[in-house]
């Protein structure tokens, strides 16, 4: 179903966003 598909996409985007945020935080800490 479309709802299930969108939920799956949301999960993937949330996971990617978390990884990117973690990496960005590491870069900021390294830059200080």
Curated annotation (Swiss-Prot):
What function does this protein fulfil? Antimicrobial peptide.
Q: What is this protein called?
A: Dermatoxin-J3
Main location (coarse class): secreted
Family named by the database record: Belongs to the frog skin active peptide (FSAP) family. Dermatoxin subfamily.
Do the record's keywords include Cytoplasm? no
Q: Name one GO cellular component term.
A: extracellular region
Asked if Cell membrane is a keyword of the record, the answer is: no
Tissues in which the UniProt entry reports expression: Expressed by the skin glands.
Q: Where in the cell is it found?
A: Secreted
The processes (GO biological process) annotated in the record are:
defense response
Keywords tagged on the record:
Amidation, Amphibian defense peptide, Antimicrobial, Secreted
Biological classification of the source: Eukaryota, Metazoa, Chordata, Craniata, Vertebrata
Coiled coil ranges? none
Residue positions of the PTM Glutamine amide?
32
């Amino acid at each position: 179903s479309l709802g299930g598909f969108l939920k799956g996409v949301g999960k993937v985007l949330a996971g990617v966003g978390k990884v990117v945020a973690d990496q960005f935080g590491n870069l900021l800490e390294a830059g200080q």
